[in-house]
Amino acid sequence: MEDLSAASVREPVPAALKTMPTDRVFWSHFSPNLGPGGWVTGALLISMGLDFYTGVLAIIVGNIIGALPVAFAASIGPETGLTQMEASRRALGRLGVRPPAFLNWIYCVGWDAVNNVPAATALIALLLACGLSAPFWLALGLLAAVQMMASVYGHHVVQLLQKYLGALLLVTFLVIGGVQISHSTAHLTATHPVSWQTFLLATGILVSFNLSWASYSSDYTRYLPASTSPTKIIGLALTGLLGSAIPFQILGLLTASSIAEPSPTAVIASFQHAMGPVGIVALAAIALSSITGNSFNDNTASYSLISAGLHVPRIAAAVLTASLGYVLAVAGAGQYASLYTDYLLVTMYWIAPWIGIVLADWYFGDRTPKPVPPGWTRGATIFTVTSVLTIGLFSTSTIYTGPVARWLGGADIGYYIGFFVAALWYALGARSRTSS
């Protein structure tokens, strides 16, 4: 079991404990994407008006753009021995790291709920196939309890789940995918030309699918020896992210014709129909897939809550996160598709500038060990200003659409602007201070 104290999050991992095998980097970036989320995302592209070819292009471009910052962030863990939020205090300061850490905690709670809705739906169907019945709240509670226990035990148990449960899920979903494709007809051409605004919006959803892991990345590389090759870490992380997200989303494209709507209920019904008498295998895989993803969410959320300034034992943070995720999932179960797309897009508006600053500081700043700034730094101000302006001007969702997004016909470029503006602003300021 990982150390339960708040200090284990705020302080670097001792060198004696940095013994994690390097292959875990691949599994920790591969397994959390194994689930109906990627499938739903691929099917969602068809409902947005993309055909198969433009959908594949959006999937490849969006996932590569989203995965690169995550992979580069993963290499920060071994040298610092810190979680991703704690590592960002170099640029933001001890006080300045609290807003993004708190946002990340809320973000993890939301993903907890989003992931558990299809898993609980699958578990209910699985129980019905076995002659049992359970209400949604009970099925959800069973899954949330298992995920919470994994996060209570911490990093090492979470990593084991990613490797061994992830390998099992990979084989199962490959079989499901093959069966689904044999029962489906791909939408090879669109009934009307795909507008560039629609393509940008679709690409943005796909960028966020991978970029959303940026705030987790070094959480699961900090137990590697400090001497581990950064190039190897980046390569393994990139392979894991792209190797799971791209195939699953393309499967969603290929099987969209057999899915009534881009929702977990429709995906599950399609799986059951295609798999026939062994449909329970598909149901079990979907239910189990939430454990790989949400053990990540709950564990990282417990880290983030401590980084946000609530210095409670890690177990208390994990229990609080899982409990709130459960409540949100019960409350929002009937609005999955809209919640899913809005959540993917809205979270980008703070993650993009934050990770832009973190990467600019690490790769272009001075890595000489220095005391962590105790208060609010220039980097924290850049993060706050860029995030607010990005949301106010560029955001596109059912919640709010900014004036620039309206002028562009609904195209969403806010995350690109936020990332590059924050990174350049921070890097240029750091260079001018160094030269002076």
Where in the sequence are the language-model features?
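Membrane-interface "cap" regions at the ends of multi-pass membrane proteins
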Residues: 1-53, 198-204, 222-232, 433-435
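Membrane-water interface regions at transmembrane-helix termini and the short interhelical loops
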Residues: 47-48, 75, 99, 121-130, ...
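Hydrophobic transmembrane alpha-helices that form the core helical bundles
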Residues: 97-131, 290-307
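Transmembrane alpha-helical segments of multi-pass small-molecule transport proteins
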Residues: 101, 128-153, 167-178, 203-217, ...
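Selective recognition of specific alpha-helical transmembrane segments in multi-pass small-molecule
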Residues: 35-38, 61-69, 104-115, 168-179, ...
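Juxtamembrane transmembrane-helix boundary signature
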Residues: 59-92, 99-113, 427, 434
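Hydrophobic alpha-helical segments and their helix-loop junctions in multi-pass secondary transporters
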Residues: 151, 167-192, 207-211, 251-258, ...
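C-terminal membrane-solvent junction of multi-pass transporters and transport-like membrane proteins
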Residues: 16, 355-428, 432, 436
